[in-house]
Amino acid sequence: MDIADIESRSSQELHEILVNLRKEFVNLVFQKKLGQCNNISRFSLIRKSIARILTTLNKRRREEKNA
């Protein structure tokens, strides 16, 4: 996900996406431990997407708090 896509979504949608990304990340960790994970680069993509979403959500909270 790119930052423009993330910022265009509502906070509720971002929370849902965040939950799904975290579940996918946990599944990838299990697959890696079992030796079944073929796409290792997906780890960094998921982690970066999670970080972008959390950054956007925290930015929105700070803006609401200061407004």
From Swiss-Prot:
SUPFAM superfamilies: Ribosomal protein L29 (L29p) (SSF46561). One of its GO terms (cellular component) is ribonucleoprotein complex. One of its GO terms (molecular function) is structural constituent of ribosome. The keyword Electron transport does not apply. Keywords: Ribonucleoprotein, Ribosomal protein. The keyword Endoplasmic reticulum does not apply. NCBIfam families: L29 (TIGR00012). Belongs to the universal ribosomal protein uL29 family. This is Large ribosomal subunit protein uL29. It comes from Wolbachia sp. subsp. Drosophila simulans (strain wRi).
